[in-house]
Amino acid sequence: MSAARAPRAHVPEVVWHDVECGAYAEDLPLWRDLATIHGGPVLDVGAGTGRVTLHVAARGYEVVALDRSPALLAALRERATGLPVQTVAADARDFDLPGRRFGLILVPMQTAQLFGGPEGRAAFLRCAAAVLAPGGLLAIAIADALETFDEVRCMPPMPDIREIDGIVYASRPVSVHEEPDGAVIRRIRETVDTTGHRTVEEDLIRLDHLDPATLEAEGAAAGFRVDRARAIPETDEYVGSTVVMLRG
């Protein structure tokens, strides 16, 4: 369990994003290495509260953080004081950054699997192509196959836990089940405050089925050149990822 100061006065969207995503670090060395090779400016797609943006910007690279959530970006701006960071509130499938070109575009974690299938990915690739500099790199992480489970038939993973100003936040994955075009992850979110008051709510997230070969083919159809993919290993807490590399 880690203690931290309250982000954005306990805005629930910010807190749960930090609890469920903020501790993941296995991919950071790759993003850092790519920034070293390609330089800035860097576009971070699905930036959230800045897990990747802050890591890259702290090494001196200009980063534009794009996310559709104003609340998450507000928290990011607070944390980015003194760093070369700009935020843009927009949907990754429908954004325009006039006059901007990026040598590196990053799409970390499973962001690309939230685009809503082939049409959503095609829309994103069109937007990305419009802002990627000639010879630049678009690096897209997709999760390796998720194993289905439920809490009745097997032991679920350990919860993600964080304490903020005496309030304990816990997010526990309780099932992953398959649908025709994706996988649905069900979590139970619980809080316990300093008086012992407890809240419980359910959260569902749907990830599109997507494999590297499919994404590479979609990238080629959108006019990108396909480079060798990179692997991010799994950990005890997180599945591994494959990072598809597309060049402008």
Question: Predicted segments — roles?
Answer:
Residues 69-71:
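Conserved SAM/SAH-binding beta-strand->alpha-helix loop
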Residues 82-94:
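Conserved SAM-binding strand-loop segment of SAM-dependent methyltransferases
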Residues 97-104:
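A short acidic, Gly/Pro-enriched loop at the edge of an enzyme's catalytic core
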Residues 1-40:
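Conserved class I S-adenosyl-L-methionine
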Residues 49-61:
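Conserved SAM-binding loop of SAM-dependent methyltransferases across substrates and taxa
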